[in-house]
Amino acid sequence: MQPYQRDFIRFAIDRGVLRFGEFTLKSGRTSPYFFNAGLFNTGSALAELGRCYAAAIVDSKIPFDVLFGPAYKGIPLAATTAVALADQHQLDVPWCFNRKEAKDHGEGGSLVGAPLAGDVLIIDDVITAGTAIREVMQIINAQQAKAAGVLIALNREERGNGELSAIQEVERDFGIPVVSIVSLTQVLEFLADDPQLKQHLPAVEAYRAQYGI
């Protein structure tokens, strides 16, 4: 585990973004942990989150020309990551986002920011069913651009209804890598090393044995 990954898990736990207990997911599964990136909701939290995304981008070595944040949740993520890439890594990267509804006046159309062109790195919080990414792929294709990959905060490493996870389905269907700041593997590693949180390890391991990929 890289230092930025350990920092991210500790930060997510401290912010209440990553919690342990008993949670019913939209899928109907009862999960021993829950991840809610919406709670990175202050200036300092967003700044730290951007630094973690930026570190993951540099670590991934995925070549790209522009960062794209899908509306709505991806917009602040793309913005803070672009700032962190410039501040921490001296990489001045263009970024853009889409509107949910196209405007017909002012800065018209459905895209805002830098031109969506070349190799596009999509940035979002999680991939649950892959539906949002499929919509993004249509936007990118409509601009004659090309997806370089997807970056998310957490990979749950969990099967969907079939044998594959939603992330594996995206990788298979579009032939692009999906990388994450951390995956469940690293969360388990963190729990094993933390005396206070170790009590949650058996439940998370059991859940992984049942639903993991």
From Swiss-Prot:
<keyword id="KW-0808">Transferase</keyword>
<dbReference type="InterPro" id="IPR000836">
    <property type="entry name" value="PRibTrfase_dom"/>
</dbReference>
<feature type="binding site" description="in other chain">
    <location>
        <begin position="72"/>
        <end position="73"/>
    </location>
    <ligand>
        <name>5-phospho-alpha-D-ribose 1-diphosphate</name>
    </ligand>
</feature>
<dbReference type="GO" id="GO:0005737">
    <property type="term" value="C:cytoplasm"/>
</dbReference>
<feature type="binding site" description="in other chain">
    <location>
        <position position="100"/>
    </location>
    <ligand>
        <name>5-phospho-alpha-D-ribose 1-diphosphate</name>
    </ligand>
</feature>
<keyword id="KW-0460">Magnesium</keyword>
<dbReference type="InterPro" id="IPR004467">
    <property type="entry name" value="Or_phspho_trans_dom"/>
</dbReference>
<dbReference type="InterPro" id="IPR029057">
    <property type="entry name" value="PRTase-like"/>
</dbReference>
<feature type="binding site">
    <location>
        <position position="156"/>
    </location>
    <ligand>
        <name>orotate</name>
    </ligand>
</feature>
<keyword id="KW-0328">Glycosyltransferase</keyword>
<comment type="subunit">
    <text>Homodimer.</text>
</comment>
<feature type="binding site">
    <location>
        <position position="105"/>
    </location>
    <ligand>
        <name>5-phospho-alpha-D-ribose 1-diphosphate</name>
    </ligand>
</feature>
<dbReference type="Pfam" id="PF00156">
    <property type="entry name" value="Pribosyltran"/>
</dbReference>
<feature type="binding site" description="in other chain">
    <location>
        <position position="26"/>
    </location>
    <ligand>
        <name>5-phospho-alpha-D-ribose 1-diphosphate</name>
    </ligand>
</feature>
<feature type="binding site">
    <location>
        <position position="128"/>
    </location>
    <ligand>
        <name>orotate</name>
    </ligand>
</feature>
<comment type="similarity">
    <text>Belongs to the purine/pyrimidine phosphoribosyltransferase family. PyrE subfamily.</text>
</comment>
<dbReference type="GO" id="GO:0004588">
    <property type="term" value="F:orotate phosphoribosyltransferase activity"/>
</dbReference>
<dbReference type="GO" id="GO:0044205">
    <property type="term" value="P:'de novo' UMP biosynthetic process"/>
</dbReference>
<feature type="binding site">
    <location>
        <position position="99"/>
    </location>
    <ligand>
        <name>5-phospho-alpha-D-ribose 1-diphosphate</name>
    </ligand>
</feature>
<protein>
    <recommendedName>
        <fullName>Orotate phosphoribosyltransferase</fullName>
        <ecNumber>2.4.2.10</ecNumber>
    </recommendedName>
</protein>
<dbReference type="InterPro" id="IPR023031">
    <property type="entry name" value="OPRT"/>
</dbReference>
<feature type="binding site">
    <location>
        <position position="103"/>
    </location>
    <ligand>
        <name>5-phospho-alpha-D-ribose 1-diphosphate</name>
    </ligand>
</feature>
<comment type="function">
    <text>Catalyzes the transfer of a ribosyl phosphate group from 5-phosphoribose 1-diphosphate to orotate, leading to the formation of orotidine monophosphate (OMP).</text>
</comment>
<dbReference type="GO" id="GO:0000287">
    <property type="term" value="F:magnesium ion binding"/>
</dbReference>
<comment type="pathway">
    <text>Pyrimidine metabolism; UMP biosynthesis via de novo pathway; UMP from orotate: step 1/2.</text>
</comment>
<feature type="binding site">
    <location>
        <begin position="34"/>
        <end position="35"/>
    </location>
    <ligand>
        <name>orotate</name>
    </ligand>
</feature>
<dbReference type="GO" id="GO:0006207">
    <property type="term" value="P:'de novo' pyrimidine nucleobase biosynthetic process"/>
</dbReference>
<dbReference type="GO" id="GO:0046132">
    <property type="term" value="P:pyrimidine ribonucleoside biosynthetic process"/>
</dbReference>
<feature type="binding site" description="in other chain">
    <location>
        <begin position="124"/>
        <end position="132"/>
    </location>
    <ligand>
        <name>5-phospho-alpha-D-ribose 1-diphosphate</name>
    </ligand>
</feature>
<keyword id="KW-0665">Pyrimidine biosynthesis</keyword>
